[in-house]
């Protein structure tokens, strides 16, 4: 089947969980919702399910369109669908919006049952462990005892790794793409600067901006602009725009003059229109806190000692946000723990965002690995 085939029109589902969820910080959500989309069919043995975990600004809408009029497909439509690397003719694929998100799952935009008002800044801090715990509840709801694979890029890859550690018997394969076993100091610094842009916006109103009929648009816009720079290759913007001007000469002022300025402001404005600032704060802190080795004497090898999953790890040559060396740390730990791991470093000019793009070598590698996952489903 053609690589251009889509899953078509898809309908999200909001799954209610009328149960408490105790979070890593000791707080409890009395109940929670998870917004999901599914693609393909769960087989009779219920052993062909694949969980897709999203990155910082992702959500449940992985593939397809919500209507025929939709201009854009899901964020990983080139990866998930009939005849694609994660083939929905063979796998039952589940995408979800994580807790703390702003696309239907319980988060800052949800109603706090204790107050009858939106949580806003009162939504509790969540971690990758908390997400995986809620995803395990989702697996129970769907009747899935074991995922054929848990797949994610960037922050999604951290979730795939945490799944293999937290629930070793429930994951057969973990695909960790463009990720890291913990953030570097530089990455934490980037996240903090982004948060400060939001927190110091006069319209933030201590996180309760919606009750004041405001939005910290300036801060969120700057956070996204800065983040977008780091997701590209070192001189990705230079190759794309150079020093091209929007007009024939310098204007000698502070308005938008360079094409790169126009591009970044467009990206920032688009992001403000679809994302919540409190969610952005929560997601970046979840990134900062992720460090599974910390529970095992700061030994990543010990952290993966009990995993049962086989691993596929991929990095990209020009990704400096999650450099190949960070993937090497995980690969070396898995080898030291005598676990099964396949690794590929893809030559790409697209930086961190390469994991979202349709690179031939990358797609071929994921396809080959998922063929092995499919074979395991048939044993």
Curated annotation (Swiss-Prot):
GO terms for biological process: homoserine metabolic process; methionine biosynthetic process. Gene3D superfamilies: 1.10.1740.110, alpha/beta hydrolase. Keywords: Acyltransferase, Amino-acid biosynthesis, Cytoplasm, Methionine biosynthesis, Transferase. GO terms for cellular component: cytoplasm. InterPro entries: AB_hydrolase_1, AB_hydrolase_fold, HAT_MetX-like. The record marks 321 as: Important for acyl-CoA specificity. Its main location: cytoplasm. The active site is at residues 154, 319, 352. GO terms for molecular function: homoserine O-acetyltransferase activity; homoserine O-succinyltransferase activity. The keyword Transferase applies. SUPFAM superfamilies: alpha/beta-Hydrolases. It is found in: Cytoplasm. Its EC number is 2.3.1.46. Pathway: Amino-acid biosynthesis; L-methionine biosynthesis via de novo pathway; O-succinyl-L-homoserine from L-homoserine: step 1/1. Residues 48-357 form the AB hydrolase-1 domain. It catalyses: L-homoserine + succinyl-CoA = O-succinyl-L-homoserine + CoA. Substrate binds at residues 224, 353. Belongs to the AB hydrolase superfamily. MetX family. Homodimer. Transfers a succinyl group from succinyl-CoA to L-homoserine, forming succinyl-L-homoserine. This is Homoserine O-succinyltransferase. It comes from Neisseria gonorrhoeae (strain ATCC 700825 / FA 1090). The gene is metXS.
